[in-house]
Amino acid sequence: MEPVLTEREKMVTGLRYRFEDPELDQLRLRARRLNKQFNNLIGSDEDDGKKGPEIIKQLFGSTGEIVIVREGIKVSYGVNIHVGDKFFINHNCILNDDGPIRIGYGAMIGPNSQLYTATHPFEPSERIGGSDENFTKGITIGDNFWGGGNVIILPGVTLGNNVIVGAGSVVTKSFPDNSIIAGNPAKLIRMNIPTK
């Protein structure tokens, strides 16, 4: 007999799941509260430079030691976000982490960028009325990533180490290590082989 998976387990593994679920409702509420707490703190008189990173460590599933997050961040669950050490994300970014978002060491994400893992059936009858039939495709980003401002990364994308994404790009497919990509949809501009 196959094990019965929770809606959360289905969600993070890319299986179809019901969005309206008590456990998922609680996780979304927790994320909204921590999100609000963080965004209200940054730049306020109470911002001592220590409380913000503590909130992010509570909000994200896992983080490296040095994590810098600017104000205006929005997440769906938070717990499905895993970032490496020396991670930087600029202001007003959206991390739609219905599915896992994994980002390696030394990543930099520009302002107003968006990472989406949620997707929906192509069949119209399966989407009508906000159907419970949702599914996810995780995003994986390697070490030393640099994404310019207003970058959008769509569900299921994997980007290798040392990838650079030009500002305003929409990344619809995966690219290997050392790729420099840009455009809508993003295309390979050239390879960037590190010299050090």
From Swiss-Prot:
Q: Which InterPro entries match?
A: Hexapep, Hexapeptide_acetyltransf, Mac_dom, Trimer_LpxA-like_sf
Q: Key word DNA damage present in the record? A: no
| PANTHER family assigned to the protein according to its UniProt record, in alphabetical order | ACETYLTRANSFERASE C18B11.09C-RELATED, SIALIC ACID SYNTHASE-RELATED
Q: Which family does it belong to?
A: Belongs to the transferase hexapeptide repeat family.
Q: What is its EC number?
A: 2.3.1.-
Organism's domain of life?
Answer: Eukaryota
Keywords, in A-Z order? Acyltransferase, Transferase
Cross-referenced Gene3D superfamilies, in alphabetical order? Answer: Hexapeptide repeat proteins (2.160.10.10)
- Disulphide-bridged cysteine pairs: none
Q: What is this protein called?
A: Putative acetyltransferase DDB_G0275507
Q: Which GO terms describe its molecular function?
A: acetyltransferase activity; O-acyltransferase activity
Keyword DNA-binding set for record = no
